[in-house]
């Protein structure tokens, strides 16, 4: 999961891989997307703008069956892979093709570092995450039918850049050292903690 610009272990972490896989199945079935959110930071398991983040009470993935027939959604996980298949009655031309293309429209980088306190002793310093590039991206839908291709924007997404992250030991009985370390963490001053 992402928390305050850092990758952290949490209950439910990774659930967005499920919502993202379902989102891509919904796109391929050309169902109506009612609500979709991108992640705060870029994810590596899918192209930019093809992700779907969920967070209880904050973000959801919602879609509607905009076809004239019922649909059936099958989902299963096997061998480390997750698959969703959406079944329905196809009424469009069988020679029609649909392709989704992610286009990166801009990039950003984060300056400096981010420091996080741990219960390790003073002097402990461990890099927990490398810098992540931020970017903006657009997802395009290309439909080719009867030799004609149309292009439609599906969504646009902005992903934050994050700096290199370090865990810093703060455990000490010396109040002067503890205050200096806490000040360094508050100011993200790596030189002061080394």
Indicate residue ranges for each PLM-predicted region:
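Well-ordered beta-sheet/strand-loop patches within structured domains
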Residues: 1-194
């Amino acid at each position: 999961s992402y928390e305050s610009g850092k990758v952290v272990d949490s209950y439910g972490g990774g659930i967005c891989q499920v919502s993202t896989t379902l989102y891509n199945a919904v796109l391929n079935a050309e169902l109506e997307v009612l609500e979709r959110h991108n992640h705060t930071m870029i994810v590596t398991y899918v192209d930019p703008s093809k992700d779907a983040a969920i967070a209880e009470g904050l973000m959801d993935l919602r879609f509607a069956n905009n076809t004239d027939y019922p649909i059936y959604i099958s989902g299963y996980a096997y061998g480390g892979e997750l698959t969703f298949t959406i079944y329905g009655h196809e009424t469009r031309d069988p020679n029609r093709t649909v392709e989704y293309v992610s286009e990166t429209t801009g990039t950003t980088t984060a300056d400096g570092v981010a420091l996080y306190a741990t219960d390790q002793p003073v002097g402990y310093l461990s890099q927990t995450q490398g810098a992540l590039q931020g970017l903006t991206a657009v997802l395009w839908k290309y439909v080719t039918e009867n030799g004609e291709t149309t292009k439609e924007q599906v969504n646009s997404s902005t992903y934050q850049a994050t700096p290199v992250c370090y865990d810093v030991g703060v455990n000490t009985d010396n109040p002067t050292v503890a205050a200096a370390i806490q000040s360094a963490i508050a100011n993200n001053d790596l030189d002061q903690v080394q």
